[in-house]
Amino acid sequence: MPPPPHIKPENVLKRAQELIAVGQAPAALNVLHEHVTSKRTRSSPIASLEPVMLLFVELCVDLRKGKAAKDGLYQYKNIAQNTNVGTIEVVLKKFIELAEKKVTEAQAKADEIQSSLESAAPSSNVEDLEAIETPETILLATVSGEQSRDRTDRAVVTPWLKFLWETYRTVLEILKNNARLEVMYQTTALQAFQFCLKYTRKTEFRRLCELLRNHVQNAAKYSAQMHAINLSDPDTLQRHLDTRFQQLNVAVELELWQEAFRSIEDIHTLLSLSKRPAKNVMMANYYEKLARIFLVSENYLFHAAAWNRYYNLLRQSAVALAAGQGTKKENPSVTEADMTKAASFVLLSALSIPVISTSRSRGALVDVDEARKNKNTRLTNLLGMAQPPSRAVLFRDALNKGLLKRARPEIRDLYNILEVDFHPLSICKKITPILKQIGADPEMEKYVLPLQQVILTRLFQQLSQVYESVELKFVYELAQFPDPFQITPAMIEKFIMNGCKKGDLAIRVDHTSGVLTFDTDIFSSAKALHSGSAAGSAESDVGSVQRLQNTPAEIARLQLTRLAKTLHVTCMYVDPSYNEARIQAKKAAQARAEAGAAKEHEETLARRVLIEKKKEAATDALQRKQREEETRKRIRTQQLQEAEKQRLLDEQREREKKRLKDEQDRIRQQELKKQLEELKSGVKGIDISEIDLEDMDANRLRAIKLAQLEKEKNELNERIRTTAKRIDHLERAFRREELKHIPEDYEAQKKRDMELYEAIKAETLKEAEEKHKEAVALKHRLSRLVPVFSSFRKEVSEKRHEEFEKRRKAAEREFEAKKKQRVKEVQERRRREKAEREAEERRRKEEEERAKREEEERIAKEEERRRVLAEEKAKREEERKRLDEIALRQKQREEEAEARRAARKSGLAEPPTRAAEPERPAERTAPRLNLASRTGGAPSWRERQAAKEATGAAPAPAPVPAPAAAPAAAPAPAAEAPKEEVQLPRRTGGYVPPHLRSGASASPAAPPSNGPAPEKYVPRHMRESSSSQPPSRTQTPPAPAAAASSDKPEGSPAPQKWVPRWKQQQQ
C-alpha cells in the first residue's frame, strides 16, 4: 500500500483548512485526529505541530467531540512535555476558552429564544449534567408542546454546560501529577470551581472534589515516575493548599457541608505534610469555615472551640502586626470591631454548648462508644488542639484572655446570668431582653435554640436540688421566653425525656396530678456523666452546676468522707502527739528525699542517656527500615513498570496482529468484490447473487471464471462454424454471378479514375503558381529591410565589442591587483616560515647542546659511581682474603687432626706436625657457587669491570718462598704424570671444587697450564689475565707442597687435587 499522502503537519493543516472551506468540518477533524494520534507525529517539530493542535481543538469544540479532543490532547502532552511545556498550556487554554465561549453564546441564544417569557434563573435546573434526559423529561417533552425556560435551557445551554464540564475534567486528567504542568493544573482547578459556583453545579462540584482528592492520593502512589509532583516541596504544597481553600470557600457558598468538611480534612492533611507554618490569613479562613460547618452540624462544642481558635489567631495577628513581625498580606486585617465581634461569638458559642444531649436516637452509652471517641479525636486534630475541648476549659480560657471586657454588653450580661448568678425563678424575666437583642442579629439568631436548651438544663438541675416535686404549671410559667422564641409544653416534656434517657436527669412526670417528681432515692448510684454528645454537649461534671445545697442522696453517699475529715480535725486538736508524729514523719520523709535526691538525679541522667541511646537506635532502625522499604518499593515499582511496559507491548503487539489480520481480510474482501464485479461485467451468464464471499477465495473464483470462459469459447466456436458454413455457400453463389459483370465494371472504374486524376493535377498546378507569386512578393517587400538590419546589427556588435573590451580591461586590472596581493601574501608567508624555521633551528641547537651537557654530566656521574664501586669492591676483596686465610688455617688444623686419627687407626707413625707442613698460599677466596652461566656467552658487567681493573693493575705477587727443609722435592710433582679422574656431573647450585670451576683448563683432570698449585684459589679475572701471559711470568708451585704430598699415604690422591673430607674418610 502506498504511504499516506499527508505526513508533514503543514500539509495536514492545509488539507484540513481546505476541507473546512468546502463545509466538511467532520472530515477535517478526522484528518487532524489521525495525524495527531499517529506514531509519525512524535518526530514532528513542536513549532509546526502547535497550529495543527489549535485547529484540532477548535473543531472538537465546534462539533462537541470531547472524546476525540481527549485522545489528541493526551498524545500531544506525551510528545511535548519533554521539550516545550508552554505549548501544552497554550493549547489547553485555547480549548477551555473556546468551550466557555460556546456556553456564553448558548446562554445568549437561550435568552433570545425566551425574550418574550418571564426572566428566570440564569442556569438550568438540571441536577446532573451527565444524566440530562430522564424518563420523566422525555415523557413531558412528548405529551407537552409548551416551551418553558427550563426546556429551552435543557435543549440549548445544558449540552454546552456538559461539554464545558467535560473539558475541565479532561484538562485536569491530562495535567495531573506532572510537576512541569502544575501551575496550569491549579489554574484549571480554580476555573472549574468558579464554573460550579457560577452555574450552581452541586453534583459536578462533588465529582470535581473527588477527582482532585484522587489525584493527590495517586501523587504519593506514583512518586517514582518521571515529572511526578513532590508534596514535600513547599511551593507545590502551597499551591495545593490554595486550591483546597478555594474548594472550601465554594463548598460553603454552595452549602455543601459534607464536601466542606472533607475539604477541611484535605487541608489538615496537607498542613500536616507542610514543613513551614501556614499563613495566618489562610488559617483564619480555615477556622471560620470550620466554625460554620460545626454550627450547621449542630456540634456546638467544637463550634465554640473553632471560634476560640479563630479569636486566638486574630489576636496573634494583631500582636504580630503591631510588633512589625509580619506583613499585612500574610495576616488578616484586624480592627477593634472585628475583635469585639469575635470575642462576642466566642462567648456566645461557649454559652450555647448543651449541658446534656438533645438527641433521642442515642442510647445511654452512646457517648462512650469507640466510634464517638474516634470522631472527637478527629475533630480535635482538625482544630489543632492537644486534647478534646470541654465547656469548662473554654470558659476558663475565655476568662483568662479577658474576653468579657471585649464582648458586647448583652453577651456579657448573658454570661453573668447563666454562669455566675443563675436564679431559676427569675431567669426568664432577666434573659428576655437579651434574647430579643440576640434574635435581632441575623448571625446570632442561630444561637437562641441551644441557649434555650442550656437554660432548661440549668433550671431543672437547680429545681432538683431544692424541690422534691413541682407542678407542671409552675415549670411552664418559669420557662417563658419572648414571643418569637416561645417553647411549648410538648417541647419541655421532650427535653425532660431526653435528659432522663441520657441519665442526666431523674424526673417522673405525672400527667394525672400535673406534678413533676424528682428522684429522691438516697441509695441510688451517681448519675452517668457523659462527655460530648451527637449535638456537641459539654462534659457534665458536677462542678459545672451551681450547688445550692446537697441532696439527700449526696448526703448519704458522702457520709464516710465527712466522718473521716471530722475525725482527722478532732485528733489534731485533742492529741498533740498525733500532730508531732505527723511533723516528725514529714521531716523524716524530707530527709530521705534529700538523701536520695542525688542518687535519683544520677539515675535520672543515666536513664536519660539510655533513653537517648534507645531513641538513636530506634531512629537508626526506623531509618534503615525506611530505606529498605524505599528500596523494596522502588524495586516493586520498577517491576510493576516493567510488567506494565511488557503488558502494553504485548497488547500493542496483539493489536498490531489483529489490525494486520483485519487489514488483510479487508483487502481480500475488496479484491474478491473487485474480481466479482469484473467477472460480472466481463463474463456473461454468471449469477453472482448466490455466491457467498465468506466461503469464496481467489482459486475458486478463478476456477469459476475459467469454466465460464471455456463455456463461452465453445459456444462461440460453434456459432462461428455454423456461420462459416452458411457464408461459404452464399459467397460461392455471389462470385458466380459477379463473373458476368466484371469487364463492364472495370471500364467504368478506369474512366472515373482518369477524370479524378486530371482534376487533382489542375488543382495542384494552380496552387503552386499562387504560392510562387506570394513568395516573390514577400522577397521584394523584405529586401528593403536588409540595409537597416545590417546597420542595426553592426551597431549592436560594436557596442557589445566596446563593452567586452571594458570588461576585459577591468578584469585584467583586477587580476593584476589580485596577483600583486597574492605575491605579497606569498612573500610574507615565506618570510614568516623562514623566521619560524630559524627559530626552530635555534631551539633545536639549544636542545642538542643541553642534551650534550646532560650526557657529559651523566657520564661524569657514572664514572664517579664506578670509581666508588671499585673502591668498595677492593675493600671487600681484602676482607675476603683475610677471611680466607683464617679459614685456611682452620682447615689445616682439621686436616692435621684427621691425619693423626687416620694414623692411629692404621697403626702407622704420627703424621708430620704442623711445623713441617708447608704454608698454604695466602691468595684464596671463599668457594664460588656453581651459578648458571649467562645465556649467549657474553660476559656480565662485573666481569668486564674486573677485566679492566686486571689489565691496568700491578703484576701478580711473588710466590711464597718454600721452606728449606725440602728444596729437592720441587721438581717431583712436575715430572709425575697427572692421573685421570672421572669428572662427576655438576649439580646446579651445589658446591664445585676449584679445579672443576670455569676458570680451569679444558681438561678437568689436568692441572693448569701456567703451573700454580692446585690448592691455591685464583680469581677468574686473574686466571683469564694469567692465561694470556708468557710462562716466564707465571708463579712456580711451592716446594713444600710436593714434600707434603710425598709424606701422605699411597692411597691418598695426587697432591695437585683437593679431596673432600668425606671422601678422605672413605679412603
UniProtKB/Swiss-Prot annotation:
Composition bias, Basic and acidic residues: 617-632, 642-665, 795-901, 916-926
Record-linked InterPro entries: EIF3A (IPR027512), eIF3a_PCI_TPR-like (IPR054711), PCI_dom (IPR000717)
Biased composition (Low complexity): 965-976, 1025-1046
Chief location category: cytoplasm
UniProt keyword annotations, A-Z: Coiled coil, Cytoplasm, Initiation factor, Protein biosynthesis, RNA-binding
One Gene Ontology term of the molecular function aspect: translation initiation factor activity
Region (Disordered): 617-665, 795-1067
GO cellular component term, pick one: eukaryotic 48S preinitiation complex
Subcellular compartments: Cytoplasm
Alphabetical list of HAMAP family matching this protein: eIF3a (MF_03000)
Originating organism: Neosartorya fischeri (strain ATCC 1020 / DSM 3700 / CBS 544.65 / FGSC A1164 / JCM 1740 / NRRL 181 / WB 181) (Aspergillus fischerianus)
Reported function: RNA-binding component of the eukaryotic translation initiation factor 3 (eIF-3) complex, which is involved in protein synthesis of a specialized repertoire of mRNAs and, together with other initiation factors, stimulates binding of mRNA and methionyl-tRNAi to the 40S ribosome. The eIF-3 complex specifically targets and initiates translation of a subset of mRNAs involved in cell proliferation.
Coiled coil regions, renumbered to chain: 92-121, 608-899
PANTHER family according to UniProt: EUKARYOTIC TRANSLATION INITIATION FACTOR 3 SUBUNIT A, EUKARYOTIC TRANSLATION INITIATION FACTOR 3, THETA SUBUNIT
Name this polypeptide is given: Eukaryotic translation initiation factor 3 subunit A
Span of domain PCI: 339-523
PROSITE patterns: PCI
Subunit (UniProt): Component of the eukaryotic translation initiation factor 3 (eIF-3) complex.
Sequence similarity: Belongs to the eIF-3 subunit A family.
One GO-annotated biological process of the protein: formation of cytoplasmic translation initiation complex
